[in-house]
From Swiss-Prot:
UniProt entry tagged with the keyword Repeat: no
PROSITE patterns assigned to the protein according to its UniProt record, in alphabetical order: RIBOSOMAL_L20
Species the sequence originates in: Rhodomonas salina (Cryptomonas salina)
GO BP terms: ribosomal large subunit assembly; translation
UniProt name for this protein: Large ribosomal subunit protein bL20c
Disulfide bridges in this chain: none
A Gene Ontology term for the protein's cellular component: ribonucleoprotein complex
Main location: plastid
SUPFAM superfamilies: Ribosomal protein L20
Family label: Belongs to the bacterial ribosomal protein bL20 family.
Amino acid sequence: MPRIKRGNVAVKRRKKILKRAKGFRGTHSKLFRVANQQVMKALRYAYVGRKRKKREFRSLWITRINAAARLNGTKYSSVIHSLKESKIAINRKMLAQMAVADPDSFVKVLSSAKAS
């Protein structure tokens, strides 16, 4: 029975890990064992980071909407409440964008929400 040669598979696996570890400092990008640990850790951080990014952007949008609302004499919570009451379906991202880029249209949306 011939022996099983799997050298090329192992080499490919190691090369894949070392390629992902490119840019890491010191032996973290040179030695396979250390690089493998660091790549796994980096992937965990990347996964968590993708979740945190959504949280952080939502809080940024809320802060921007609140700041623009207070310039117009109201609060964030009352703005959101009046938008829901008047059935104006506009998300926080768009509201924040309007508040920063086009304050006049933001004021119009606020007034139409209050009027309804």
